[in-house]
Amino acid sequence: MIFVATSLSCRWWWPVM
């Protein structure tokens, strides 16, 4: 579950960066 959360987090924070 943590992996999934991290994946989603990176997906939305990547563009932000």
From Swiss-Prot:
One of its GO terms (biological process) is L-tryptophan biosynthetic process. Keywords: Amino-acid biosynthesis, Aromatic amino acid biosynthesis, Leader peptide, Tryptophan biosynthesis. This protein is involved in control of the biosynthesis of tryptophan. This is trp operon leader peptide.
